[in-house]
Design a protein with these regions (language model features):
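Short, low-complexity disordered leader/linker segments with a strong preference
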Residues: 1-33, 331-334
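Short, glycine-/small- and polar/acidic-enriched structural segments
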Residues: 29-169, 174-179, 183-190, 205-207, ...
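Conserved C-terminal helix/tail region of periplasmic/extracytoplasmic solute-binding proteins
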Residues: 301-334
Length: 334
C-alpha cells in the first residue's frame, strides 16, 4: 500500500534512554521508534500526547514517538494489518472495523464524554432535543461520529427523523448558522461553539452525551500487539495516561507545551485566545472520576453498536468485550 503520510518527529530530544546493565561498560539501548497515527492535523487538542513527549513519559517507557498527521481514510485497516501499531480513533470506527473482521482493539479511553453537540442561535428557540421538530439541521456529513451522534440523540428522545429537515452543509457550521441557512447544526463541542462564543455570538447547545454518551476517541492498536507486544502497549498507555493526567491538572502549562508542536496556535492574540478556549473546553470532556481515567465502559460500546446496527452500518451484534480492553489501564501520577 502506497502511503505518503506527513510525519513529524515528535520526540525533540530523547533523554539518555534505557541503559543495559552490562557491568562498567554499559551501553545505551536505542529507544524503540513507534508511530502514532493521529487522524487529524496538529492541534492543541492533542495536548496530552505533546505533554507526554515533552515531559519524557514516552522516553521513560523506552519509546521514541513519531506523530503521523493527516486524513488517512483507511487508518484502521493499516492498524488491523499491523502496518501501523497505534492510532487515535473513535469508538464507532472500531465497531465498524471489527464488523469487517479487522482485529483492532481500543486500549485506552481518552474522551470521557462524547463531544458531538447540536448548536443553534437563541432566536431559533431550541432549548431541548424535541424543539428540533420542524427545524432545518445542518450536518457535516451523513456518516462518521457526528452523524452517529445525531442518530443516537434522536433515538434517545423519540424524535422522528422525518420531523427534521437534515441538510448536508459540510464543515461550514458557523457560516450556515450565522447566515440563517439552517436553524441548528451538528458540531463538535470544542470547535464551532467555542469559536462563535469568542466572537461574541450567543449560542444554545444540546450535548449528545446528556442523552446518549457513546464511545469517542481513544488509543487503538491490534490484537497481535496486545498478545505479542504487551509491554509496548502498556508503555504507550501508561505514558499517554500520564500526559492526560498532567494536562487535566495543569491545562495552562499543557497549552504552553503544545505550542512547541503547534506554534501556529498562537500566531496572533485572537488565534491564541481561541486555541486556549478550545483546550479548556476539551478538558471538560476528558475529565474522569478517580480511578476511571482511561477506562472503557461496556454499556457505552453496546449503545454505540446498537445505533450503528439500526443505521445499517453493521449487520450483526458482536461481543463488545472483544472491541476494547482495560488490561493496560493503570492509575498514574502526572
Amino acid at each position: 500500500m502506497h502511503r505518503k503520510p506527513k510525519r513529524i518527529l515528535a520526540l525533540l530530544a530523547l533523554m539518555a534512554g534505557v541503559l543495559a546493565a552490562c557491568g562498567g561498560g554499559g551501553q545505551a539501548v536505542p529507544a524503540e521508534k513507534v508511530t502514532l497515527a493521529m487522524g487529524f492535523i496538529p492541534n492543541v487538542q492533542f495536548a496530552p500526547f505533546y505533554v507526554a513527549v515533552e515531559k519524557g513519559y514516552f522516553a521513560e517507557e523506552g519509546i521514541e514517538l513519531e506523530f503521523d498527521y493527516g486524513w488517512e481514510t483507511d487508518l484502521l485497516k493499516l492498524v488491523g494489518s499491523d502496518e501501523l501499531q497505534f492510532a487515535i480513533a473513535s469508538g464507532d470506527q472500531v465497531i465498524l472495523a471489527r464488523s469487517q473482521d479487522l482485529p483492532v482493539v481500543y486500549v485506552m479511553n481518552w474522551y470521557r464524554r462524547f463531544p458531538v453537540c447540536i448548536v443553534s442561535l437563541p432566536e431559533a428557540g431550541i432549548q431541548e432535543p424535541l424543539d428540533l421538530a420542524g427545524k432545518r439541521v445542518g450536518t457535516p456529513a451523513t456518516y462518521g461520529a457526528s452523524y452517529i451522534g445525531w442518530r443516537a440523540l434522536v433515538d434517545a428522545v423519540g424524535l422522528d427523523e422525518t420531523d427534521v429537515e437534515l441538510i448536508s452543509i459540510g464543515y461550514t457550521q458557523v457560516a450556515a448558522l450565522s447566515e440563517g441557512q439552517v436553524d441548528a447544526a451538528i458540531c463538535y463541542a470544542m470547535n464551532e461553539p467555542v469559536q462563535m462564543e469568542l466572537a461574541g455570538q450567543a449560542v444554545d447547545t444540546i450535548y449528545v452525551a446528556d442523552y446518549a454518551n457513546l464511545v469517542s476517541n481513544g488509543l487503538i492498536t491490534n490484537e497481535r500487539s496486545v498478545q505479542e507486544r504487551a509491554e509496548l502497549v502498556q508503555g504507550m498507555v501508561r505514558a499517554a495516561l500520564r500526559g492526560l493526567a498532567f494536562t487535566l491538572e495543569n491545562p495552562d502549562e499543557a497549552f504552553d507545551i503544545s505550542l512547541k508542536f503547534v506554534s501556529e496556535a498562537a500566531s496572533d492574540a485572537q488565534t491564541e485566545a481561541v486555541s486556549r478556549a478550545i483546550l479548556a473546553r476539551s478538558v471538560e470532556f476528558w475529565s474522569a472520576e478517580p480511578g476511571e481515567l482511561g477506562r472503557s465502559e461496556p454499556a457505552q460500546w453496546a449503545a454505540a453498536q446498537e445505533v450503528m446496527r439500526q443505521m445499517g452500518l453493521v449487520q450483526n451484534v458482536e461481543d463488545v468485550n472483544a472491541m476494547f480492553t482495560n488490561q493496560f489501564v493503570v492509575e498514574v501520577e502526572p
